[in-house]
């Protein structure tokens, strides 16, 4: 196998019916969305459809998220979280925390992808924004996703409590 999307981040691919080209729509924690047309089989850039200008965010004190990992309460798995701190964050101060939880099977919140504008707005207004993936969510393999099979709520609350434990201990 040869990787043909070398750019860091989360990629969504659409292959043309001809099989000769594909659209690569991607972003990362530090790079806003880009949409490119690339050729197959080598991934060579053919055309840039759209590229978000990072400079437009300078006046907004865009806070880059940090991906973290912490143990579940039962110690069976490590869970992933994403934290956005206020731009002027001072570790000696206390801040209100907004927890963005979802937890539906097969979905994934924590990924190397440009963050939501709403979360940035909250951070710029003095909130710490914490998102996490509980057991049963996607992007971590079939075994991790199947934790919620037959009982979606079994780990959801416990895993979110582990996230809160992590925040308190940090």
What are these regions (language model features)?
Residues 5, 12-170:
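Serine-hydrolase catalytic core recognition
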């Amino acid at each position: 196998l040869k990787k043909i999307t070398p750019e860091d981040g989360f990629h969504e691919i659409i292959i043309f019916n001809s099989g000769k080209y594909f659209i690569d729509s991607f972003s990362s924690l530090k790079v806003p969305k880009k949409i490119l047309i690339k050729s197959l089989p080598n991934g060579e850039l053919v055309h840039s459809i759209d590229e978000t200008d990072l400079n437009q965010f300078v006046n907004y004190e865009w806070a880059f998220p940090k991906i973290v990992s912490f143990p579940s309460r039962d110690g069976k798995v490590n869970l992933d979280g994403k934290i956005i701190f206020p731009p002027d964050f001072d570790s000696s101060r206390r801040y209100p925390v907004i927890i963005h939880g979802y937890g539906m099977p097969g979905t994934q919140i924590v990924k190397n992808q440009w963050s939501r504008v709403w979360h940035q707005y909250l951070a710029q207004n003095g909130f710490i924004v914490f998102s996490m993936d509980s057991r049963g969510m996607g992007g971590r393999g079939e075994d991790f996703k199947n934790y919620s099979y037959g009982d979606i709520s079994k780990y959801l609350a416990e895993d979110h409590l582990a996230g809160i434990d992590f925040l308190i201990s940090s």
